[in-house]
Amino acid sequence: RMIARITLEATSPLAVGSGEKDIITDAPVTRDVNDLPYIPGTSLMGIIRHSMKDLKESDSIFGYQKGDKGEGSKVLISDALLLGSNQKAMDGLKNIEQDEYLKAFEVLPIRQHVRITEKGTGANHGKFDEQVVYKGTRFIFEMELLSETKDDENMQNILNTISSPTFRVGSGTRNGFGSMKVVSLKYASYDLTQEKDLDAYLKKSSSLEEDWNEAMEKKPCELQGT
């Protein structure tokens, strides 16, 4: 198994809509149990898969279903949780009432838009708005790849995709929203046929808030082209 823990920073406003309307906006952001913005792991999976769709290995990595034939995904991706001012993940139920940094996410900016017709003009009654997360907000998530070798280029391809300058998350990407950069990457490989690795793998906490001492840190600048 290969596991990577990745911290992303929004370098432009981020619009990750919940798909539902409320009385404040047409497109509120997704929020977790603490009412803080987060990026669903399913969304990240879809974005990464779409970005890698031209690779011949895409189906074998992310799975496929074609008629009676199919294969499950070899990749598991957690939700990307907000990092607090202490750079710890907001994993699990937290008391955020006294935290000024986290309270700033209670009311988020709203951006106005106009729907454009196929003729390139504004549609009648085409105004809508959406909530966005602040530029500079950081999120952390983990990704696990089921691999037969410790040196799997599929993991490297995924990491290169995430660290690409063209990687975008959420809606409005053509309007400059959703630009992200990797600010931290930790990773480790576990050979589950080896007792020591198996023990370390089983003892690893699933909480993104917990330290991961056996992981190696990789600089973002080392990702592309390695």
Task: Please report, for each region that a protein language model flagged, where it lies by residue.
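RNA-binding basic/glycine-rich loop and surface signature characteristic of RAMP-family CRISPR effectors
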Residues: R1-T226
